[in-house]
A protein has these predicted regions:
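Short cysteine/histidine-rich zinc-coordinating motifs and their immediately flanking basic loops
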Residues: 47-52
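Electrostatic cytochrome c docking/interface patches
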Residues: 15-32, 43-44
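The canonical Cys-X-X-Cys-His
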Residues: 33-41, 115, 119
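Detector for the c-type heme attachment site
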Residues: 37-45, 58-59
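Bacterial N-terminal signal peptides
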Residues: 8-14
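Short Fe-S-cluster ligation motifs
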Residues: 63-83
Length: 129
């Protein structure tokens, strides 16, 4: 009887704590192909239609030197962390109305997991960590 209770308790504990999302950087690189029309990443990245995305996580929105951001983006007060980026990439205009970003967003949680894993590989100099 004790074993059944212990087993049931372990199962309930496991179910009450969802697994942390894990993305595949290689799959994220494929998802990033949709972003390449406007953004670059890596050691030779430059600002283009959109800002370069090196070292995205941990930096304030609207802070890449040499890129002209919308006033909405600059005044958003956002510091890019994983939860904020996940919310943003689902619908950029919903998260920051009047942002220059016209991309409609990613709808697949797996694609979002993957692109996060891909972007997190790059430091602010575009080097893979």
């Amino acid at each position: 009887m004790r074993r059944r209770i212990l087993l049931a308790s372990l199962i309930l504990a496991a179910l009450s704590h969802p697994a942390k999302a894990v993305g595949d950087p290689a799959a994220g690189e494929k998802v990033f192909q949709r972003c390449r029309a406007c953004h670059q990443i890596g050691e030779s990245a430059r600002n283009a239609v959109g800002p370069k995305l090196n070292g995205l996580f941990g930096r304030p929105a609207g802070s890449i030197e040499g890129y002209t951001y919308s006033s909405a983006n600059k005044s958003s007060g956002i510091v890019w962390d994983e939860p904020t980026f996940r919310d943003y990439i689902k619908g950029p205009q919903a998260k920051i109305p009047n942002t220059k970003m016209v991309f409609p967003g990613l709808k697949s949680d797996q694609e979002i997991d993957d692109i996060v894993a891909f972007l997190k590989q790059f430091d602010s100099d575009g080097k893979k960590k």
